[in-house]
């Protein structure tokens, strides 16, 4: 499996011209051209450029300086917050970006035209699948402060979607509480999913001694749906609940959120009678965890360095 992955990577880097110092016959390598493209016509914060391209600050700075030296880009403070640096294309940079787009389209067409129509469709379909799966693998889930910037952005988008999709209207202060202090350790935890540095989903869990854990505020941005983020987030929240001794998890949801209902059922939840008086909920779900103690042992045990896992058998 690893050998195939590496072979695929070598083929792609060779075919797209990533090894050349003159990408698309211009006087710069792919990395600089990609930075030029990523800045975009509207400009972009340096922080986001680094996250999207997976670059450390030193490498990103070198690429930007090379574009500045060519007169293709400028770096300046943001108009809204002078502490934030923004990269913008110059007029020359915009023309160069348009030329790179044109040559990239021609290069792609040349590769596709070498195949018959059936193989062309097969290749493009496989590319679509690879892109989706590699994007899914790039998603990171991190525990964050539920009152932090990214958490608040996700929760605001979540509340807006609930109000848009349901005729009940959602008021987070009217139902079962999930306040920041309830979603911080040791009372609970809150997680945000990130893709290329941008928050695309969230979820929280409330711990209760001797009672089921409550999974709250699960949401995934529309742009990230289909990547398996919801399932990963749910597994993360369940793992957190089990690590804190829960034998059962509870989730309630609104009837309009059919995707959430489908996810919960496929993840082993069963619908049960209402276990709380959440006014926005139409469905209540429960999941029993098996082998909670074994799970806690496995997650706290650390294998000695350089020793095979079989030594624990």
Locate predicted features.
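N-terminal leader segment of winged-helix/HTH proteins
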Residues: 1-31, 150-155
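N-terminal helix-turn-helix DNA-binding core of bacterial DNA-binding proteins
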Residues: 18-59, 64, 70-72, 180-188, ...
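Canonical helix-turn-helix DNA-binding module
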Residues: 43-85, 94, 197-198, 202-204, ...
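Conserved GNAT acetyl-CoA-binding A-motif
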Residues: 47-48, 212, 234, 240-254
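Terminal interaction helix/tail motif
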Residues: 102-146, 285-287, 301
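Acetyl-CoA-dependent GNAT
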Residues: 136, 143-216, 221, 234, ...
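C-terminal "cap" of GNAT-fold acetyltransferases
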Residues: 144-147, 247-267, 273-313
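Conserved acetyl-CoA-binding loop-helix of GNAT-fold acetyltransferases
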Residues: 220, 226-239, 262-266
């Amino acid at each position: 499996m690893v050998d195939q992955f590496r072979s695929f990577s070598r083929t792609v880097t060779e075919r797209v011209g990533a090894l050349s110092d003159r990408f698309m016959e211009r006087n710069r390598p792919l990395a600089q051209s990609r930075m030029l493209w990523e800045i975009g016509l509207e400009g972009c914060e340096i922080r986001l450029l680094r996250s999207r391209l997976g670059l450390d600050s030193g490498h990103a700075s070198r690429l930007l300086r090379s574009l500045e030296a060519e007169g293709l880009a400028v770096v300046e403070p943001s108009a809204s917050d002078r502490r934030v640096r923004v990269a913008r294309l110059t007029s020359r940079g915009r023309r160069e970006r348009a030329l790179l787009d044109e040559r990239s389209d021609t290069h792609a067409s040349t590769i596709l035209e070498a195949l018959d129509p059936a193989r062309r469709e097969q290749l493009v379909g496989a590319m679509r699948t690879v892109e989706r799966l590699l994007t899914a693998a790039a998603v990171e889930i991190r525990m964050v402060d539920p009152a932090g910037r990214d958490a608040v952005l996700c929760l605001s988008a979540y509340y807006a979607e609930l109000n848009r999709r349901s005729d009940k209207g959602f008021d987070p202060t009217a139902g079962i509480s999930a306040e920041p202090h309830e979603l911080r350790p040791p009372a609970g935890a809150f997680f945000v999913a990130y893709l290329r540095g941008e928050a695309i989903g969230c979820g929280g869990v409330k711990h209760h001694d001797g009672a089921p854990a409550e999974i709250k505020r699960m949401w995934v941005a529309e742009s990230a749906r289909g990547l398996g983020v919801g399932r990963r987030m749910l597994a993360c929240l369940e793992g957190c609940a089990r690590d804190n001794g829960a034998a059962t998890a509870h989730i309630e949801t609104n009837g309009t959120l059919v995707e959430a209902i489908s996810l919960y059922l496929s993840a082993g939840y069963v619908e049960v009678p209402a276990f709380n008086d959440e006014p926005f909920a139409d469905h209540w779900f429960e999941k029993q965890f098996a082998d909670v103690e074994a799970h806690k042992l496995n997650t706290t045990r650390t294998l000695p360095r350089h020793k095979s896992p079989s030594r624990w058998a």
